[in-house]
Amino acid sequence: MGRGKVELKRIENKISRQVTFAKRRNGLLKKAYELSVLCDAEVALIIFSTRGRLFEFSTSSCMYKTLERYRSCNYNLNSCEASAALETELSNYQEYLKLKTRVEFLQTTQRNLLGEDLVPLSLKELEQLENQIEISLMNIRSSKNQQLLDQVFELKRKEQQLQDANKDLKRKIQETSGENMLHISCQDVGPSGHASEANQEFLHHAICDPSLHIGYQAYMDHLNQ
């Protein structure tokens, strides 16, 4: 029995899709190689995976030569427009290769900084990596110390604000105590409507000497007994 015709559609399962891509890609690259050998054909094959990874095959020493040859061919298109479009394509492709190389380098550097893939590195490269890590640690410590200093400065500023508020509160309490003392002394008068000589003398000393404010209440309690 012959095999039924398989419907071509996107494979929904991610793992199956990746496995199929790998198999079909390898088969396509193999077919391109066989075509170039058996038929002495110039073949160029470019494949991008869903993740943007590049796979390519070229029978010439450089893919650019084949693309340049492709550019020179005219498929019933305006030669100037086709040339400009292809030049843009080639420019974008070269830019992509540069970015791809840069990304791979950064990924390798990141793994090295994390202590991975260190076996291929030479002694000089390991020393350079060590210096980079030490510089990074110095920057981290400097940033941490600066944040600690900022926190200490903020705490001192808040402490000074509390001290100023405490002084202001003490001053207001002292002013209120002085006013209450004067009010009480005005009420302590004799039958004639005048304060006694003893009270007048004490009041005079109390006003002149704030240190007597504390004993004034005890003195008034003694007179009322």
Swiss-Prot record:
Alphabetized SUPFAM superfamilies for the sequence: SRF-like
Annotated ranges, domain K-box: 89-179
One of the record's GO molecular function terms: RNA polymerase II cis-regulatory region sequence-specific DNA binding
Database matches in CDD domains: MADS_MEF2_like (cd00265)
PROSITE patterns, per the entry: K_BOX, MADS_BOX_1, MADS_BOX_2
Cellular component, GO annotation: nucleus
Pfam name, any one: K-box
Function: Probable transcription factor. May be involved in the control of flowering time.
Entry protein name: MADS-box transcription factor 5
Gene: MADS5
